[in-house]
Amino acid sequence: MIMRRIDPSKLELEERLVTVNRVAKVVKGGRRFRFAALVVVGDKNGHVGFGTGKAQEVPEAIRKAVEDAKKNLIEVPMVGTTIPHEIIGRFGAGNILLKPASEGTGVIAGGPVRAVLELAGVADILSKSLGSNTPINMIRATLQGLSELKRAEEVAKLRGKSVEELLG
């Protein structure tokens, strides 16, 4: 699948910090701490991405994570306020079930998945985490699922049928 790069400078991106993890390296003189930040960015209009950053200070780790997230933007196909069809996103041991929901349902998702879906602009969706609940695996599984979504027009074109034939 060929992904064309999305230019972040043309979008009004909002950032959300998902987690900050403190890691320690034990040396002769004591512990040396470093920080790893996980950030999700999106324009609430069908574009979302995530990034990680590591540094000796929290603000620097967050800045690096935001930069990384802007490089990894994907486009999310939407039908109204929800997604076109049900899909399971998989990454490592993390599986995320994403189901379209009727208008007014809201975002039913936990933690990191909620951040991704809200910043992508999906207003009505059901999701369930199956397997690993590690934030990075959940986010990657969600983005993998969202990137594989296809609109009815795309599926019809691939099958060589009309949208009416496809939808019955």
Curated annotation (Swiss-Prot):
Biological-process GO terms, alphabetical: translation
Keywords: Ribonucleoprotein, Ribosomal protein, RNA-binding, rRNA-binding
Record-annotated S5 DRBM domain positions: 13-76
GO molecular function per UniProt: rRNA binding; structural constituent of ribosome
Pfam families referenced in this protein's UniProt entry, alphabetically: Ribosomal_S5, Ribosomal_S5_C
Database matches in InterPro entries: Ribosomal_Su5_D2-typ_SF (IPR020568), Ribosomal_uS5 (IPR000851), Ribosomal_uS5_bac-type (IPR005712), Ribosomal_uS5_C (IPR005324), Ribosomal_uS5_N (IPR013810), Ribosomal_uS5_N_CS (IPR018192), Ribsml_uS5_D2-typ_fold_subgr (IPR014721)
GO cellular component term, pick one: small ribosomal subunit
Domain notes: The N-terminal domain interacts with the head of the 30S subunit; the C-terminal domain interacts with the body and contacts protein S4. The interaction surface between S4 and S5 is involved in control of translational fidelity.
General function of this protein: With S4 and S12 plays an important role in translational accuracy. Located at the back of the 30S subunit body where it stabilizes the conformation of the head with respect to the body.
Quaternary data: Part of the 30S ribosomal subunit. Contacts proteins S4 and S8.
NCBIfam families given in the database record: rpsE_bact
Family: Belongs to the universal ribosomal protein uS5 family.
Protein name: Small ribosomal subunit protein uS5
Species this chain originates from: Bacillus velezensis (strain DSM 23117 / BGSC 10A6 / LMG 26770 / FZB42)
Gene: rpsE
